[in-house]
Amino acid sequence: MIPGEIQVADGDLLLNEGRATLQVAVANTGDRPIQIGSHYHFFETNPALQFDRAATRGFRLDIPAGTAVRFEPGQTRTVTLVAYAGRRHVYGFRGDVMGPLDEIAQSDQGAQHEQGAQA
């Protein structure tokens, strides 16, 4: 082995295998580009992005870690989302969930966020 060399197994690596996925059409209604990172809770993205927010609770973009998707002003594109795994607790982001995804009904903040996004 050479120092710094990376040896990988033959074949393809299957990412997010067996997890629920969702395709959603997303429109940027704002006047600025919006970029969403690979692990951002999609439900809590910028309110200028219009899509079925309720359906995306507990999902993130199904893209490689460390990458992002950019939505230009006026652009509509379909993205694939994948369900969070593990404990499924979400903290931070826009502060709309702040806890376990499976035990908490949509919070008042989340409902307000959703209403603001639809206005």
From Swiss-Prot:
Enzyme Commission number, as recorded: 3.5.1.5
SUPFAM superfamilies: Urease, beta-subunit (SSF51278)
GO terms for cellular component: urease complex
Name of the featured protein: Urease subunit beta
Family of the protein in this entry: Belongs to the urease beta subunit family.
Listed InterPro entries: Urease_beta-like, Urease_betasu_sf, Urease_subunit
Pathway involvement of the protein, from the record: Nitrogen metabolism; urea degradation; CO(2) and NH(3) from urea (urease route): step 1/1
Chief location of this protein within or outside the cell: cytoplasm
